Amino acid sequence: MGFSSIWHWIIVLVVVLLLFGAGKIPRLMGDVAKGVKAFKKGMADDEDDEAASVSAERRGIEDGKPAQTIYPPQQPQQPQQPPQQPPVHRDDAPRG
């Protein structure tokens, strides 16, 4: 007895209607549709951005100019010396 019986699907449908109500289901489906549309739009925007960057790279190659890599400015680093500890003076004279 799997979920291939029509009675199982009717029971599932009734439970879903009882949990969410008849008015909430269309709103949920509308929200899902909006989410899918936003996802597709985002994917299309990413593809457009990628295509624009590829075409910009090709224009640079077509112009005969090598692509320039911009590096952030770096501060010169000076070698650090380990901290010097002050010498320890012992008093060799016996105490007492």
Swiss-Prot record:
Its GO CC terms? TAT protein transport complex
Q: What membrane topology does the UniProt entry give? A: Single-pass membrane protein
Q: Membrane-spanning regions, if any?
A: 1-21
Region spans: Disordered:
42-96
Quote the Pfam families the UniProt record gives.
TatA_B_E
Q: Where is the composition biased (Basic and acidic residues)?
A: 56-65
Q: Which InterPro entries match?
A: TatA/B/E, TatA/E
Biological processes annotated in GO = protein transport by the Tat complex
Instruction: List the GO molecular function terms.
Output: protein transmembrane transporter activity
- Can the keyword Cell membrane be found in this entry's annotation? yes
* Keyword list, A-Z: Cell inner membrane, Cell membrane, Membrane, Protein transport, Translocation, Transmembrane, Transmembrane helix, Transport
What spans are recorded as compositionally biased (Pro residues)? 73-86
Top-level lineage group:
Bacteria
Q: Where in the cell is it found?
A: Cell inner membrane
Summarize the protein's role: Part of the twin-arginine translocation (Tat) system that transports large folded proteins containing a characteristic twin-arginine motif in their signal peptide across membranes. TatA could form the protein-conducting channel of the Tat system.
PANTHER family noted in UniProt: SEC-INDEPENDENT PROTEIN TRANSLOCASE PROTEIN TATA
Q: Which NCBIfam families match?
A: PRK00720.1, tatAE
Quaternary form? The Tat system comprises two distinct complexes: a TatABC complex, containing multiple copies of TatA, TatB and TatC subunits, and a separate TatA complex, containing only TatA subunits. Substrates initially bind to the TatABC complex, which probably triggers association of the separate TatA complex to form the active translocon.
Q: Which family does it belong to?
A: Belongs to the TatA/E family.
Q: What is this protein called?
A: Sec-independent protein translocase protein TatA
Species for this entry: Rhodospirillum rubrum (strain ATCC 11170 / ATH 1.1.1 / DSM 467 / LMG 4362 / NCIMB 8255 / S1)
List the lineage, top down: Bacteria, Pseudomonadati, Pseudomonadota, Alphaproteobacteria, Rhodospirillales
